[in-house]
From Swiss-Prot:
Its main location: cytoplasm. It is found in: Cytoplasm. This is Arsenate reductase. The lineage of its organism: Bacteria, Bacillati, Bacillota, Bacilli, Bacillales. InterPro entries: Arsenate_reductase_ArsC, Ptyr_pPase, Ptyr_pPase_sf. It comes from Staphylococcus aureus (strain bovine RF122 / ET3-1). It catalyses: arsenate + [thioredoxin]-dithiol + H(+) = arsenite + [thioredoxin]-disulfide + H2O. NCBIfam families: arsC_pI258_fam (TIGR02691), PRK13530.1 (NF010053). Its EC number is 1.20.4.4.
C-alpha cells in the first residue's frame, strides 16, 4: 500500500508543527509520510525539543522549513495548526484536503504551556488516526 502524505503547517515551523511532526511520525508512520513547515521560519524552539524529549520523541534534528509547494501538491492532507497559517496557507490543488486544528502558541509562555500544547497535539493526532 502506498503511504499518504500529511503536511503540518504553522506560522514559524518552530513549536506546534514541529511537535505535530514528531508525534505523527510515531503515531501515523505506518500509513503516512509526515512533514511540517511554516509560513516563515523561526528555527526550532528549544523548549519544543525538550517537551518532546520528555515523552521520548527526539526532534532535535528537525529543521525549520518554509512551505514547499512540491510537498503541498503531493500531499493528501494539509493541517494548519494556527489561525495565521489557516489564513495564509497557499492555495491547494483540488485533490488536497485541508483541515484546521487550532492550538495555542506556547512560545514565550511557561513550560507548562509547552507540555499542555504537546499533549493536546498528541490527542488530536490519535483522534485523527482513529477516524
Amino acid at each position: 500500500m502506498t503511504k499518504k502524505t500529511i503536511y503540518f503547517i504553522c506560522t514559524g515551523n518552530s513549536c506546534r508543527s514541529q511537535m505535530a511532526e514528531g508525534w505523527a511520525k510515531q503515531i501515523l508512520a505506518e500509513d503516512w509520510n509526515v512533514y511540517s513547515a511554516g509560513i516563515e521560519t523561526h528555527g526550532v524552539n528549544p523548549k519544543a525539543i525538550e517537551a518532546m524529549k520528555e515523552v521520548g520523541i527526539d526532534i532535535s534534528n528537525h529543521t525549520s522549513d518554509l512551505i514547499d509547494n512540491n510537498i503541498i501538491k503531493n500531499s493528501n492532507l494539509v493541517v494548519t495548526l494556527c489561525s495565521d497559517a489557516d489564513v495564509n496557507c497557499p492555495s491547494l490543488p483540488a485533490n488536497v484536503k485541508k483541515e484546521h486544528w487550532g492550538f495555542d502558541n506556547p512560545a514565550g509562555k511557561p513550560w507548562s504551556e509547552f507540555q499542555r500544547v504537546r499533549d493536546e497535539i498528541k490527542i488530536a493526532i490519535e483522534n485523527f488516526k482513529s477516524r
